[in-house]
A protein has these predicted regions:
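Conserved catalytic/switch belt of AAA+ P-loop NTPases
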Residues: 6-20
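Conserved AAA+/SF3 P-loop NTPase catalytic/coupling segment centered on the Walker-B
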Residues: 1-9, 29-31
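Charged, glycine-rich active-site and insertion segments that engage polyanionic ligands
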Residues: 17-20, 25-133, 137-189
Length: 189
């Protein structure tokens, strides 16, 4: 609302002593011009996949080169996301479920896709994590056809279906319905 925006601008113009704001946005265009004019902009980008893979191998010496390259490609050079996928138990589970989901969607196995998603009907956070991982995998398959065994046509279906389900979940839609529709669209012939 307007009052909140004005209060934020006032604080940004005259911050309390010792206070520094760090604002992030995916695009400078997403920030209001009045706020942008009061900020110093720094553009940040992921590191190249080769550097990301090298950082992964340094952090996880037991990781083989191909897996490091694949993770770096999958997460587009985001070292933190790659390390999380390697070390966080919940992220590992979500990634494994997403890989299986993508495999079954590639085979157009509606039953197995639905069975996998049904396991998340009572756990919105885990469902969101699996769908996010599926969007990452689909995006990777669109950038490199055949990545993780997924072809571009299937990747496009997965991406559309997962994003629609994630939007429905954010809007507090019925989780069971969102996942059912998602599964039907992912495995469509």
């Amino acid at each position: 609302n307007g009052a909140s925006a004005n209060a934020m601008l006032k604080i940004m113009e005259e911050p309390p002593e010792g206070v520094m704001f760090l604002l992030t946005a995916s695009s400078a265009a997403a920030v209001l011009p009045t706020i942008r004019s009061r900020c110093a902009a720094y553009t940040m980008a992921p590191v190249p996949t080769e550097e990301c893979a090298a950082a992964l191998r340094t952090a996880q010496p037991e990781l083989n080169e191909q897996n490091a390259q694949d993770l770096a490609f999958l997460y587009e050079g985001h070292i933190g996301l790659c390390l999380k996928a390697l070390t966080d138990p919940a992220a590992k589970v979500a990634r494994a479920a997403a890989r299986e989901l993508c495999r079954q969607a590639q085979q157009q196995d509606t039953y197995r896709v639905q069975a996998l998603l049904a396991g998340y009907e009572k756990d919105k956070d885990s469902a969101a994590a699996v769908l996010w991982q599926a969007t990452q995998a689909a995006s990777a398959a669109l950038r490199r056809p055949g990545f993780d065994g997924v072809q571009p046509d299937t990747a496009a279906r997965i991406l559309r279906a997962a994003e629609a389900a994630r939007r429905a979940m954010k809007a507090n839609g019925n989780l069971r319905l969102a996942l059912t529709v998602c599964g039907m669209e992912m495995a469509a012939r």
